[in-house]
Amino acid sequence: MPKIKTVRGAAKRFKKTASGGFKRKQSHLRHILTKKTTKRKRHLRHKSMVAKADNVLVVACLPYA
């Protein structure tokens, strides 16, 4: 049985937590930042969790996580 390949882009974007979930970075913080308020940018800096509905997709991309 061959090894399952890890999706490298997903490996760089998601980290598994001890409880089995995945943490991720918020989007919309790379460019076009002048029109966004300081409060909005500050809230986007915090990490977030992957939704339960999307957990299955992330697990498929990261078979050894």
Curated annotation (Swiss-Prot):
Region described as Disordered: 1-26
Keywords carried by this UniProt record: Ribonucleoprotein, Ribosomal protein
GO MF, one annotated term: structural constituent of ribosome
Superkingdom to which the source organism belongs: Bacteria
GO biological process: translation
Feature: compositional bias, Basic residues: 10-26
Ribonucleoprotein recorded as keyword: yes
InterPro entries linked to this entry: Ribosomal_bL35, Ribosomal_bL35-like, Ribosomal_bL35_CS, Ribosomal_bL35_sf
Pfam families recorded: Ribosomal_L35p
GO cellular component: cytosolic large ribosomal subunit
Assigned protein family: Belongs to the bacterial ribosomal protein bL35 family.
Protein name: Large ribosomal subunit protein bL35
Species for this entry: Actinobacillus succinogenes (strain ATCC 55618 / DSM 22257 / CCUG 43843 / 130Z)
Gene field: rpmI
